[in-house]
């Protein structure tokens, strides 16, 4: 995982026994629903970055459960290589960013996210937990 530039999380919580997935509004137009993620800072592990980004973007403290996969894409002429982790909701905290958040059922989350790779990560968790 040494060539990664970003890391993020698929945060799960239970609502009366039903799983919910955390989504945040992207800062850039068209302001899609996305999984929280951000740049890996010097000295951070990808797991630490995922946890920090979930805290900053969504105001959620979550524990890393396991590595899910990697999504590579290009944005503004730069190559982004992002690791994603399954994460378990711990508690709500104060967010560092003013972002809209949404807890969605896995089916809703898959329908709301724009990119197929993101939906694939959410589906993977569903299959693994069934």
Show the residue positions of the predicted features.
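Short, well-ordered beta-strand micro-motif
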Residues: 11, 25, 84-88
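A generic structural motif
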Residues: 12-14, 25-27, 74
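Active-site segment of metal-dependent pyrophosphate-handling enzymes
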Residues: 55, 59-92
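Conserved Nudix-box catalytic region and its N-terminal flanking loop in Nudix hydrolases
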Residues: 18-56, 60
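Short aromatic/basic micro-patch
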Residues: 34, 79, 103
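NUDIX/MutT-family hydrolases
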Residues: 86, 94-126
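Conserved N-terminal beta-strand and adjoining loop/helix that marks the start
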Residues: 1-21
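Short helix-loop capping/hinge motifs at secondary-structure junctions, enriched
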Residues: 16-18, 91-94
């Amino acid at each position: 995982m040494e060539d990664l530039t970003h890391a993020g999380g698929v945060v799960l919580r239970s609502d009366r026994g039903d799983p919910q997935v955390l989504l945040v509004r992207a800062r850039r137009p068209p302001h899609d629903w996305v999984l929280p993620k951000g740049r890996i800072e010097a000295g951070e592990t990808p797991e630490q970055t995922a946890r920090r980004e979930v805290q900053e973007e969504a105001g959620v403290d979550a524990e890393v459960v396991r590595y899910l996969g990697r999504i590579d894409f290009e944005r503004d002429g730069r190559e982004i290589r992002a690791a994603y982790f399954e994460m378990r909701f711990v508690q709500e905290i104060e967010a560092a960013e003013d972002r809209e958040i949404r807890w969605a059922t896995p089916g809703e989350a898959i329908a709301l996210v724009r990119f197929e790779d993101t939906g694939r990560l959410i589906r993977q968790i569903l299959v693994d937990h069934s």
